């Protein structure tokens, strides 16, 4: 356009969905520059935003427009000429407030510009009507003076000039009337479009309320799900503790099974040893029998010793002869007795060990 912007900010741009008139459709993928401009040629104010090479907002501000804040960072206005509703999402509430204040200022300036334009049109129309009314009176006055020849000779250049001016004024008056009619039609169209946009704005406000309710429901659902997740996490913690206990129990079971296997090996060894016990018992009985036989032999030998002593006492003669033999015999007997005692001690020890 060539003019410098009056005010510039950055925001995310949205447009109302033309089919539903409820949902917002993003017009920019990211925050873009949004500016107020004054169009000198048309004596109007515009809001313009460009995303790359694409013009996403070209809205002429009229005195009937209203900028509405729908949240802390979002505002919207209806453009009847574009037959749509624009929405702007700002990064802060302060930016939204500045944009809304500038909108009010520009709207007031647009109203003053419109009033001045209407005053000029009315002044031009009144001037045309006055000029049209003066022309017949001048012609009548000129026809009163002199004869017809004099009127023809003296008034001809003036009549021609007045007639030409009158025709121009009539054309201007006709064009002015046509423009007034055109503006009335355009005004009616704007009123109807404004009514439709007002309805769309009300529906949009209702939709915002519905979104707020849905957001509240979603937030409650989110809180409920968060509580459920915390419960599940707590249950998972209990499950992990149970798993750890199960792992410890499995480890203990494995240790007990190892001990059982060791005990089974010991029991198996004891069973093998128990199979040897009867053999040892039979050997013990055999040794006992031998011991009894040895004891009997010992008893017999003792009897013989007593008998021999008696014989010695009875016959000292035989004592000298048999002394050496008896001494050797006693030595042999003592050795056998010692062996017998050693054998008995070994047998007793064996019985104790078993």
From Swiss-Prot:
Annotated segments matching region Disordered: 114-163
Subunit structure: Isoform 1 and isoform 2 encode coiled-coil structures that mediate homo- and heteromultimerization. Interacts with NFATC2; interaction is reduced by AKT activation. Interacts with NFATC1 and NFATC4. Interacts with DAGLA (via PPXXF motif); this interaction is required for the cell membrane localization of DAGLA.
Compositional bias per record (Polar residues), positions renumbered to this chain: 123-146
Residues annotated as domain WH1: 1-110
Designated name of the protein: Homer protein homolog 2
Domain notes: The WH1 domain interacts with the PPXXF motif in GRM1, GRM5, RYR1, RYR2, ITPR1, SHANK 1 and SHANK3.
Family designation: Belongs to the Homer family.
One GO BP: negative regulation of calcineurin-NFAT signaling cascade
Positions in coiled-coil regions: 92-120, 160-329
Source organism, top-level taxon: Eukaryota
Pfam family, one: WH1
SUPFAM superfamilies for this protein: PH domain-like (SSF50729)
A molecular function GO annotation: identical protein binding
Expression sites (tissue/organ): Constitutively expressed in the adult hippocampus.
Claim: Heme is one of the keywords in the record: no
Cell compartments where the protein resides: Cytoplasm; Cell membrane; Postsynaptic density; Synapse
Native organism: Rattus norvegicus
UniProtKB keywords: Cell membrane, Cell projection, Coiled coil, Cytoplasm, Hearing, Membrane, Synapse
